Amino acid sequence: MKKMLGMALLCGICLFGCQNETDKIVDEYENLGYTITYEVEENLIEKSNRMSVHLSIYVQIDEGTHNSYEREKQIFKDLMTDLSEHFYEEYGERYENQHYNGHHVSTVIYLNGSDEPFLLSNTEDDSTFIF
């Protein structure tokens, strides 16, 4: 019980840190004129006593911009690179680079140097990227 309580507390502290750092990084992008909405959710994986970070990010730029969809994807990729660098430095997590295959985004996240991926990315719906 104490172990789970400690992990839950650690999860809460880590989530607060992730949220604050994500706020700072997203602010930098918004200062460039991009509209970004996002949510950070951190879950404790009970069986392995590891935590996963789920980021849901929506990037939008002026619809009148030429190739706005491709630009949104690039901004998303840049933003995720910045976030992954922070998480690696702060928590020892490793992110494999995001892979774009047509309209699908794929990201593998590793925690604490593990060779086993514990979160495999997901879905893209228009310019909404979720994982």
Predicted regions: what they are:
Residues 67-97:
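Short, non-transmembrane amphipathic alpha-helical segments
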Residues 16-27:
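Bacterial lipoprotein signal-peptidase II cleavage site
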Residues 2-3, 7, 24, 46-47, ...:
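Context-gated lysine
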Residues 1-17:
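Sec-dependent bacterial lipoprotein signal peptides
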Residues 16, 76, 87, 118, ...:
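Phenylalanine-focused residue identity feature
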Residues 33-34, 40-64, 92-131:
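Polar/charged, Gly/Pro-rich intrinsically disordered segments
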Residues 29-31:
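Active-site metal-binding core of divalent-cation-utilizing nuclease and nuclease-like domains
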